[in-house]
């Protein structure tokens, strides 16, 4: 004789199914609220990035001319970095998927350009699965890159000649608008860096060109 499941048993199973769905929905709602709130805040301006031109991982000239009229995000790294560079590059890599349908560019400047040749940077880019045409890795004269970091982006940098002999640089990612104005700094070592950076980037994208 078949037994009909009790109402309490069915209700318990339904509850077990609904709890994770409701929890997931709540988490997604909270994330959307957080991003929306961040997008409402004013995005400050911290000065203009000077004109520059270096060589990218493909051996091609790349600089201000290629970025004119575009929103872009910059960082300073080097491929043999034993410290924060892998995390910084990982954060930059995280930006690729949410920005894939935009024209926002990613630019990584090497602070060890003598070792980071275009070939070395190309290999590094491949390991990060950097999207061609979106994420460029730049090398060039050390003095010019350091001047751009210090005077242009207002970020400290040193070749380490007075310490352990390894380059020392900022862990911040920098948001630049279509007019070459610096609009935000985001420490890649902070868990919420990507969320805040994406919110501000989307805010700038919504502004008239």
PLM segments and residue spans:
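Short loop/turn microsegments at loop-to-beta-strand junctions
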Residues: 49-50, 72, 170-172
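Short active-site neighborhood of thiol/selenol oxidoreductases, capturing the structured segment around
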Residues: 62-92
């Amino acid at each position: 004789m078949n037994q009909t499941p009790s109402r309490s048993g069915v209700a318990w199973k339904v509850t077990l199914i609904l709890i994770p769905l409701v929890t997931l929905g709540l988490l997604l709602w909270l994330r959307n609220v957080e991003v929306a709130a961040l997008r409402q805040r004013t995005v400050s301006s911290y000065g203009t990035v000077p004109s520059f031109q270096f060589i990218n991982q493909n051996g091609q000239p790349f600089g201000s001319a290629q970025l004119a009229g575009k929103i872009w995000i910059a960082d300073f790294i080097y491929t043999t970095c034993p410290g924060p560079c892998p995390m910084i590059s990982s954060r930059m890599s995280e930006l690729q998927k949410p920005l894939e349908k935009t024209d926002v560019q990613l630019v990584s400047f090497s602070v060890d350009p003598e070792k980071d040749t275009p070939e070395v940077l190309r290999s590094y880019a491949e390991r990060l699965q950097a999207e061609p045409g979106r994420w460029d890795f730049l090398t060039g004269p050390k003095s010019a890159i350091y001047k751009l970091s210090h005077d242009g982006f207002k970020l400290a940098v040193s070749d380490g000649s007075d310490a352990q002999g390894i380059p020392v640089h900022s862990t911040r990612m920098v948001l630049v608008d279509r007019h070459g104005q610096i609009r935000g700094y985001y420490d890649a070592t902070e868990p919420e860096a990507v969320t805040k950076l994406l919110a501000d980037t989307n805010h700038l994208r919504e502004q008239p060109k």
